[in-house]
């Protein structure tokens, strides 16, 4: 399959995570499954990438600089022209009481506590009807 055809048919994922190591791990995992991955180091970059590329899935860390994950989710949910609605998985290493509820109320579809196993992510994505 040519690169241009692969780019048309391969689902696109935005990984919004300020930890380079976590971004790279998620990028490799998705690329091995044939997904195109766009990386964002903060919420502002994630919003810009989402606006420009209209991804099929967004993974967003809740604790990021410039625009935190909750605000990123709210902003994406308010955008016109994104995949209707693009699935969003919120991730956090700083789980506190009420955080999951706040993320769901902001508009995420799933919630993961870091560190997590990639099988846990796969289960969440399958539950959303996303093929992994």
Q: What are these language model-derived features?
A:
Residues 64:
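Receiver (REC) domain active-site loop signature in two-component systems and cognate sites
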Residues 34-41, 49:
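Short hydrophobic/Thr-rich beta-strand motif most characteristic of the beta2 strand and flanking loop
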Residues 24-32:
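Charged docking surfaces used in two-component/phosphorelay signaling
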Residues 17:
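Conserved acidic carboxylate
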């Amino acid at each position: 399959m040519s690169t241009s055809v692969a780019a048309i048919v391969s689902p696109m994922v935005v990984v919004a995570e300020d930890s380079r190591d976590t971004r790279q791990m998620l990028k490799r995992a998705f690329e091995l499954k044939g997904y195109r991955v766009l990386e964002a180091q903060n919420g502002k970059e994630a919003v810009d990438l989402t606006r420009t590329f209209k991804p099929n899935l967004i993974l967003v860390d809740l604790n990021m600089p410039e625009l935190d994950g909750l605000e990123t989710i709210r902003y994406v949910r308010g955008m016109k022209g994104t995949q209707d609605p693009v699935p969003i998985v919120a991730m956090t290493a700083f789980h506190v009481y009420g955080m999951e509820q706040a993320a769901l109320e902001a508009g995420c579809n799933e919630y993961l506590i870091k560190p997590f196993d990639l099988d846990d992510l796969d289960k969440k994505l399958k539950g959303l009807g996303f093929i992994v």
